[in-house]
Amino acid sequence: RSVSRGLGDVYKRQVVALCVTLFVQAKDYADYVSPLVGTQSSFELSTGNTYPAISRPWGMNFWTPQTGKMGDGWQYVYTANKIRGFKQTHQPSPWINDYGQFSIMPVTGKPEFEEDKRASWFSHKAEIAKPYYYKVYLAEHDVVTEMVPTERAVMFRFTFPENDSYVVVDAFDRGSSVKVIPGENKIVGYTTRNSGGVPANFKNYFVIEFDKPFTYEATFSNDVQPEKPDGSVPVTLKEGKLEQTDFHTGAVIGFKTKKGEVVHARVASSFISPEQAIRNLKELGGDSFEVLVQKGKEAWNEALGKVEVEGGTLDQYRTFYSCLYRSLLFPRKFYELDANGQPVHYSPYNGETLPGYMYTDTGFWDTFRCLFPFLNLMYPSVNKEIQEGLVNTYKESGFFPEWASPGHRGCMVGNN
């Protein structure tokens, strides 16, 4: 009888331990986070100054819905009611602005490239924003757009109506290139768009692969034509022309779709080379969209779960973890992994491709106070990489950074 009681106690302890383990595993810290916090801001009302950065922790690339015009530092504003595209962004603040950006936008009915004409009305009621996943219904095109990123790649899922459907790729102005490869359902290109702090050879190479053959191909280019009275540039799509290199380029591909038909786009980019962009695309592997969402959620739960808080209200939990999420975005990874899985980076200081780590997009006059001590205490393995990157910055430029984005921006203080 005493042996039975002893075994019973053991089983009870095991059940309790299992329940505790399951409770801990089931905690979704990422679901406390709202990436939309701080987005109700403007040049005149400089408060918050955030955008929904859909990414992995410290990811090389972020993705965001774009409500502002090309080049606008306030690229997503909560009070806006139209989305112009879904943009790869590296912007640390609206004042520093962006670099290496390009955008993707689904449209229906007829191909439209100009950002005002391709834009679609949306409602926050039909918008879901998580750190690892974004979904919105584009009412004017009747298209549901979803995206889930890895550190250097992203998968889009478009749910189209029965219509002539298109996807616009805008490589932005100030020097860009696009090439449509119909036989591979692929678009490749590069953007040189930046706001300073880059060498003369700076490029962000991108590759976009679709899982549906094209029935329409066109490209766009201009060489700084005179602007219209409304500030826009005349747009003429060149059907059948598959390649453009100019001041501002883009591409539009299309296909016939049935009601509810799903089309995926796999996207990656590299600051090193087109070949490295294809290598970075392998981050998606053979995973389905749903598996990538789960992996992204797990990555954020692991990072956010380093800090456990107790005793607050639900709103306080949401505030805390939304702020912690912002603390785990920058400085971002500016390195990539070579064919052997080793870190290598394009140097934003001397334009060379070099071995080792590099992080960027941080202003030391702010971040030296709290962010770096916090990372050193809570995320020492990440902070070790950041410090190695700082040493590489000194080796490649002769200085530690004051404001890096991606290279020296020569503003503010804080490097000594």
Which sequence ranges carry the predicted segments?
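Accessory carbohydrate-recognition regions in carbohydrate-active enzymes
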Residues: K27-F372, N376-N416
